[in-house]
Design a protein with these regions (language model features):
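Alpha/beta catalytic cores of nucleotide-metabolism and tRNA/nucleoside-modifying enzymes
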Residues: 1-13, 17-164
Length: 164
């Protein structure tokens, strides 16, 4: 991000963002915006078929770099538009199913709350301050594990947390 500073070229964080904390980290690292389409997958408003599987509700999800999406027209985003031979396309995404999340507004509400909390942890009232004063601290795998719920069985799912 520092290489782009002052050039007028925005830095876009794209890929690997799963939680609101990841958005805060991307912005603190100098990102100007984030790509969070996969975070919206599974919402009522997201494209995709609603599926019942093993008694639970899911939505189909097609990453823009998936072979299916490329066949449907996104290949030009990956500079492969001229490759009409489907065997020559090089996919960067997948087709899958994701748990149904409810309304988009609920997901956005949770994300905004998480971003505000993350900025609060950093003492940053706005994104510019976050970029200027945000600090990264390396922690061990054991510390990461300890920072999440452990030695329990979750009995009620939270809208902003999932066990992976």
């Amino acid at each position: 991000a520092s290489a782009a500073r002052g050039t007028g070229v925005p830095v876009i964080a794209d890929g690997g963002l799963r939680y609101s904390g990841d958005i805060v980290k991307a912005l603190a690292a100098g990102g100007d915006c984030v790509m969070i389409g996969s975070m919206f997958a599974g919402t009522e408003e997201a494209p995709g078929e609603t599926i019942i599987y093993n008694g639970r509700k899911f939505k189909s999800y097609r990453g823009m770099g998936s072979l299916d999406a490329m066949k449907a027209g996104s290949a030009d985003r990956y500079f492969q538009k001229g490759d009409v031979n489907i065997n020559k396309l090089v996919p960067e995404g997948i087709v899958a199913r994701v748990p149904f999340k409810g309304m988009l507004s609920e997901t956005v509400f949770q994300l905004v709350g998480g971003i505000r909390a993350g900025m609060g942890y950093c003492g940053a009232p706005n994104i510019e301050t976050l970029k200027e004063t945000g600090k990264f601290v390396k922690i061990s795998a054991a510390s990461l594990k300890e920072s999440h719920p452990h030695d329990i069985h979750i009995t009620k799912e939270a809208p902003n947390y999932s066990v992976e």
